[in-house]
């Protein structure tokens, strides 16, 4: 088994490379951060620096030579950005990578998508994989849905390659550069966290190691009998209030911080004002309508299909994941001083 991991220099991809190296699996990693690439090489991975949005066939040939399994973790993930940027990174890059993977004989292609394509500014619990909103919440969600359509078309036209789509919800853990670090910065800098209705929303999260475990399961020969293009929700399997998650992080980081309850309409009004300023300055605002809304609405997933078909069960609990993440932040000097 030889695995190519895209988006390998941070987040999920970085954790995936570490997992595979520890298992003694031959790994080729790709990403844009060459400094991180050198660290991956020290771990035992082969690193090929590349920007998938600018990849050409000669680079793809080198990247995919000898690869039988591809974990496509690379994505432009943001609540803020242009349609062109999302299409380039999430749709076009996925299409070209998938076409090259088929051409070079990749047997398994695991595509990391997002449950953001479910979000519609309403409360939802135990969402199943076939749910679709009347319209997508933002350009990111639309682009991830479009990337799944690309995968579906490739799976129908190329039965020799098995495609699998995973939708992990709210990823977090070591090497995260977005969710937990931003939250920790706000806790330290402001001494309080503003949550709609005090954080009463019921949510799901996914520790990186659990998402990697799901990718590993989906790559096994036992799954070859499953339909190509199959989609699976992935979470920690623990519905929790947002407040309880934030409070657990506050406790583990030992930060003097309070959770303050604010009315959702007021926080949303502030976010919309910031968005208007952001459009004028072309900078991502500290708060967005989408970001604030994700804190307000119940949003949990049903992972029954992954449990029954992949044999997926989380290997790290939510509390363990928060504890491990807090320890990593402390040990690697990632906390504000």
UniProtKB/Swiss-Prot annotation:
What family is this protein classified in?
Belongs to the NAD(P)-dependent epimerase/dehydratase family.
- Alphabetized PANTHER family for the sequence: BIFUNCTIONAL POLYMYXIN RESISTANCE PROTEIN ARNA (PTHR43245), NUCLEOSIDE-DIPHOSPHATE-SUGAR EPIMERASE (PTHR43245:SF46)
**Name used for this protein in its record:** Uncharacterized protein YbjS
Pfam families noted in UniProt: Epimerase
* Lineage summary: Bacteria, Pseudomonadati, Pseudomonadota, Gammaproteobacteria, Enterobacterales
Gene name on record? ybjS
